[in-house]
C-alpha cells in the first residue's frame, strides 16, 4: 500500500490526519491557505468592532465588546498555531497577508457606520461564521478540527450577544429601529458572500470536499444560514433587503435573490470600501509592535543563557 493510498484510506474512514502523518503536498498547501485565511480574518475582524469600543453606548456594552475583540485575537493566535503544525511560519503567512498575497474574509472590508452595525456583525456575521465553522469541527485535519470546537463555543456566545444588542434596538425608538434596519440592509448581502462563490464557480471546493477539509459546499451552507436567519429578522420586526425572498413550501427552504458577484470580486481583489484602510492599520500595528517582539526575543535569550549557566 502506498503512502497516498493509506492517506486516502484514512480520509475515507474518517480518521483524523495529524501533523506527524504523511499527507500530499497539495493537501498541506490547501490547509495552510484555508487556516491562514481563517486566522487573518479573526485578526482583521478586530478592526471594524474595535472602532466602536470607545463609543459604546453603555459600560456594559463596552465590556462585552472588549471581551469579544479579545476573543477574536485569541482565535487568530490559536489558528496560527494550527497552521504552524503544517510546517509554515506564522510570521511568513502574516507577512503574506500584509503584502496582499493572502486573503481574509471579504466582510471586514465594509465600514461600521453606526452602533447597530456592531450588533448586526455579532448576529449576522458571526452567525454566518458559525454555520461555516460548525461544519469544520469535523474537518479531516485534527489540529484544525480541535481548534474549531473551542472557537465555535465562543462564537456562539458572540452571536447571542449580537442578537441581544439588536433586540434592544428593535424594542427602542423609531430612530433606533431605523438604524437597525439600515445596518441589516448594508450587511445582509455581504454576510451571504462570506460563504464564497457558488459551487460551480469555486476553484478550491471540489478538492477540499474530496479530502473532507470542507464537509459541505458553499451553496448548501449559504442556504442553511438563510433558513436559520430569516425567521430571526422577522422576529425583530425587521425586513430582509431582498425583493426575491420567498418561502418555498415544497422544499421547506427560503428562495433568495442573486448575489452581486461583481461586488464580491471587487472586495476580495482589494477594491472594497475599506481594503486599503484595513491593511494599512495592520501594517502600522506590525511596525509599531516591532520593539515588543525584539524585547521578547532578548528576554528569551537571557532566560536561556541563565538556564545553560
Regions found by a protein language model. Give the residues of each.
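Conserved alpha-helical segments that form or flank metal/cofactor-binding pockets of metalloenzymes
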Residues: 1-6, 63, 68-96, 162-167
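Internal, conserved structured core segments that host functional sites
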Residues: 110-161
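Glycine- and acidic-residue-rich phosphate-binding/metal-coordinating active-site segment common to enzymes
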Residues: 139-190
Amino acid at each position: 500500500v502506498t503512502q497516498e493510498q493509506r492517506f486516502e484510506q484514512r480520509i475515507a474512514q474518517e480518521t483524523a490526519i495529524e501533523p506527524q502523518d504523511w499527507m500530499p503536498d497539495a493537501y498541506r498547501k490547501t490547509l495552510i491557505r484555508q487556516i491562514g485565511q481563517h486566522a487573518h480574518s479573526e485578526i482583521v475582524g478586530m478592526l471594524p468592532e474595535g472602532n466602536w469600543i470607545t463609543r459604546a453606548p453603555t459600560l456594559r456594552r463596552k465590556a462585552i465588546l472588549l471581551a469579544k475583540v479579545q476573543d477574536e485575537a485569541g482565535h487568530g493566535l490559536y489558528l496560527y498555531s494550527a497552521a504552524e503544525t503544517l510546517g509554515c511560519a506564522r510570521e511568513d503567512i502574516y507577512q503574506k497577508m500584509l503584502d496582499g498575497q493572502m486573503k481574509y474574509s471579504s466582510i471586514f472590508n465594509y465600514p461600521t457606520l453606526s452602533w447597530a452595525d456592531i450588533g448586526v456583525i455579532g448576529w449576522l456575521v458571526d452567525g454566518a461564521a458559525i454555520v461555516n465553522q460548525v461544519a469544520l469541527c469535523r474537518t479531516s485535519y485534527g489540529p484544525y478540527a480541535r481548534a474549531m470546537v473551542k472557537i465555535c463555543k465562543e462564537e456562539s456566545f458572540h452571536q447571542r450577544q449580537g442578537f441581544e444588542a439588536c433586540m434592544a434596538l428593535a424594542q427602542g425608538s423609531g430612530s433606533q429601529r431605523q438604524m437597525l434596519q439600515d445596518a441589516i440592509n448594508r450587511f445582509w448581502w455581504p454576510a451571504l458572500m462570506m460563504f464564497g462563490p457558488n459551487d460551480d464557480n469555486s476553484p478550491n471546493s471540489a478538492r477540499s470536499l474530496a479530502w473532507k477539509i470542507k464537509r459541505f459546499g458553499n451553496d448548501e451552507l449559504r442556504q442553511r444560514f438563510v433558513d436559520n436567519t430569516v425567521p430571526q429578522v422577522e422576529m425583530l420586526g425587521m425586513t430582509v433587503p431582498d425583493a426575491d425572498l420567498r418561502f418555498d413550501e415544497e422544499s421547506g427552504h427560503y428562495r433568495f435573490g442573486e448575489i452581486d458577484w461583481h461586488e464580491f470580486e471587487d472586495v476580495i481583489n482589494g477594491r472594497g470600501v475599506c481594503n486599503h484602510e484595513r491593511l494599512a492599520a495592520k501594517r502600522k500595528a506590525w511596525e509599531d509592535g516591532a520593539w515588543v517582539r525584539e524585547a521578547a526575543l532578548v528576554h528569551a535569550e537571557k532566560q536561556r543563557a541563565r538556564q545553560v549557566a
